[in-house]
From Swiss-Prot:
Transit peptide start and end: 1-29
Database matches in InterPro entries: LbH_gamma_CA-like, Transf_Hexapept/Carb_Anhydrase, Trimer_LpxA-like_sf
Record has RNA-binding as a keyword: no
Protein family (similarity comment): Belongs to the gamma-class carbonic anhydrase family.
Molecular-function GO terms, alphabetical: metal ion binding
GO cellular component, one term: mitochondrial membrane
UniProt subcellular location: Mitochondrion membrane
Name of this chain's protein: Gamma carbonic anhydrase-like 1, mitochondrial
Coiled coil, from the record: none
Length: 252
């Protein structure tokens, strides 16, 4: 009888010790447990409009507000400031800056100003010609070019990394090679190829070459249409749905 009582007392003491150990561990765990974050209800990411660029595309200056035609494509990270007009069918590509703070800048019909170009205009021109920067219709301005208070007549190609200074004039159906520098007041005659620093006459363009100039501008205009559709207020899924319906013979 005494042996049984001793065994029961030992079991009770052991169980009490085990309970105390577990209780101490649980208390320690509660103290070291990190506070749970307070979750808040917020719109899903597909319903939030994000803008990581941190820059403004259209910058009004005083009474002057840049004007962009409805069907003209202007890339999201382009800067248009002041007296800038972008006409129908034209395109201004990524990273270009058009500063119309001192005078007018015009990008004509179906012309294109490519990546990282800088277009500016001075108060006045030393040649007496208009100080505005005028890019007429069917003109292709290559990437990284710098244009300041110059006039480019219809159907011209300005090569990449070219510089056109104040008062320079590029007449119709002319081509300027890449890396060319046109000094102030220099005139590039019609139908000629010029290049170099400073720009010099190289040769006369053939009839076939002059006919290809507007075709290049039109091709770039068609390419800009693919980019233009990606920046509609809504996604372009409906375009794929319409194509799928047409492939099945369903009227859209």
């Amino acid at each position: 009888m005494a042996t049984s009582i001793a065994r029961l007392s030992r079991r009770g003491v052991t169980s009490n010790l085990i309970r105390r150990c577990f209780a101490a561990e649980a208390a320690l765990a509660r103290k070291t447990e990190l506070p749970k974050p307070q979750f808040t209800v917020s719109p899903s990411t597909d319903r939030v409009k994000w803008d990581y660029r941190g820059q403004r595309q259209i910058i009004p200056l005083g009474q002057w507000l840049p004007k962009v035609a409805v069907d003209a494509y202007v890339a999201p990270n382009v800067v248009l400031a002041g007296q800038v007009t972008v006409w129908d069918g034209s395109s201004v590509w990524n990273g270009a800056v058009l500063r119309g703070d001192l005078n007018k800048i015009t990008v004509g019909f179906c012309s294109n100003v490519q990546e990282r170009c800088v277009v500016h205009a001075a108060w006045s021109s030393p040649t007496g010609l208009p100080a505005a920067t005028i890019i007429d219709r069917y003109v292709t301005v290559g990437a990284y070019s710098l244009l300041r208070s110059c006039t480019i007549e219809p159907e011209c190609i300005i090569g990449q990394h070219s510089i056109l200074m104040e008062g320079s004039l590029v007449e119709t159906r002319s081509i300027l090679e890449a890396g060319s520098v046109v000094p102030p007041g220099r005139r590039i005659p019609s139908g000629e190829l010029w290049g170099g620093n400073p720009a010099r006459f190289i040769r006369t363009l053939t009839n076939e070459e002059t006919l290809e100039i507007p075709k290049l501008a039109v091709a770039i205009n068609h390419l800009s249409g693919d980019y233009f559709s990606e920046f509609l207020p809504y996604s372009t899924v409906y375009l794929e749905v319409e194509k799928f319906k047409k492939s099945l013979g369903i009227a859209v």
